[in-house]
Regions:
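Conserved ABC ATPase "signature" region
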Residues: 24, 74-92, 201
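ABC ATPase "signature
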Residues: 179-183
Length: 262
């Protein structure tokens, strides 16, 4: 979340760089350019607090249009109606206020607002973590369809690797502010190497009453291995090791002297 907010300028960067299309976007002058602000948008975790409660949905979704495009009131309204249709809401929603919608509807409106400037990258910060499972699936399906239709990229931030599996082609697993494992989806889900990745994967709920005990035992064994082998993953100060390359696409933060994982 901190990285995502730093990319769009909501959090200060104390060290390091973030490159977007070869440009350092932690440079304030670069980040303030109109093209960059148009091309990089964000969907926030808490949709209610990210909307001005005094504004109607028409004004909320139209805000990027007013910042970047010079449209007549009629063109603006028509564009907002098109965006609402994309997320499955009708024109009637335009004159309502944020509190009059469900959490899932508000999050879809957040998607529409992010989409209004026709961005190339949308940072999605835990966009479905506050929603129940059925609504999560609905919002994710809208996001996936929009991604294909508009040919845009997501920086999808989540603690739930079950959700991530549905959305992402490449994964970057972070712990204590550092990457502990990166790779293609197949690398991470079929061959996880860092214990933190394994712990996240073991936390994915599995509807499998037949193998419930076996799944529970695997989680216990992973925790036991972690407790007994922490030096494989962290130095004496608890710092994450640097990434080591396992394949063309798979990197993991292991002790360079370690021989394999669990």
């Amino acid at each position: 979340s901190t990285i995502g907010k730093s990319i769009i300028g909501l959090e200060p960067v104390t060290s390091g760089k973030v490159l977007y299309e070869g440009q350092d976007v932690t440079n304030k002058a670069r980040r303030r350019t109109s093209d960059y602000n148009r091309n990089v948008q964000m969907i926030f975790q808490d949709s209610l607090s990210s909307f001005n409660p005094k504004k109607r949905i028409l004004d909320i979704v139209a805000e990027p249009l007013r910042n970047f495009d010079r449209l007549s009131p009629e063109e603006e309204r028509r564009k907002v109606i098109e965006l609402m249709e994309i997320i499955g809401l009708s024109e009637e929603a335009l004159l309502k206020y944020p509190h009059q919608f469900s959490g899932g509807q508000r999050q879809r409106i957040g998607v529409a607002r992010a989409l209004a400037s026709n961005p190339r990258l949308i940072i999605a910060d835990e966009p479905v973590s506050a929603l129940d499972l059925s609504v999560q699936a609905q919002v994710l399906n809208y996001m996936k369809r929009i991604q294909d239709e508009f040919n845009l990229s997501y920086l999808f931030i989540s603690h739930d690797l079950g959700v991530v599996k549905h959305m992402c082609d490449e994964l970057f697993i972070m712990y204590r502010g550092r990457f502990v494992e990166t790779g293609k989806a197949d690398d991470i889900y079929a061959n996880p190497q860092h214990i933190y990745t394994k712990r996240l994967l073991s936390a994915i709920p599995v509807i499998d009453p037949v193998n419930r005990e076996a799944n529970k035992q695997r989680r216990i064994e992973a925790e036991k291995f972690y407790q007994e082998n922490q030096t494989m993953y962290y130095d004496e100060n608890g710092r994450v090791f640097d990434l080591q390359q396992l394949s063309d696409s798979h990197f993991v933060a292991l002790n360079p002297s370690a021989k394999g994982g669990n």
